[in-house]
Amino acid sequence: MTMDKKQAGARPSWETEVEILPIRSEQIDFGHPLHGTYITTGPRSQRGFRLSKFCMAFMSPETRAAFKADPERVMAEHGLSDYEKSLIREQNFNAMVRYGVNAFMIFKLANAFGVNQNQTGAKMRLQSFEEFMKTRNVKDAL
């Protein structure tokens, strides 16, 4: 398996890498992914597994209450790295996706901050909520 790794500025290499997999698909052009998308690969998923598992814990009302009371304690109990904790503190959902966190799990974490799916989408597209809702196929969304 060959990997084409590119670096951009001070960002970690894993944030910009495109991993070429030993499979062929007419639907996926691994050499030219769509701008702003990140191909979910085994290594990327493994890297984000701990943080995805942490987000999954937010299905429990007890975890949500404990996080609301003391987020640092809950993050420490789950053994998150300093970098993973910083992603959570900053609510940096795009970096979480690049890191390998499952997008559906990110919604569970965002909800703990009182951020709904549409607000999360707006944040990930770097748009205001109002701008984002205008792009949705919902009549009279705002």
Residue ranges of predicted features:
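Charged, low-complexity intrinsically disordered segments
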Residues: 2-142
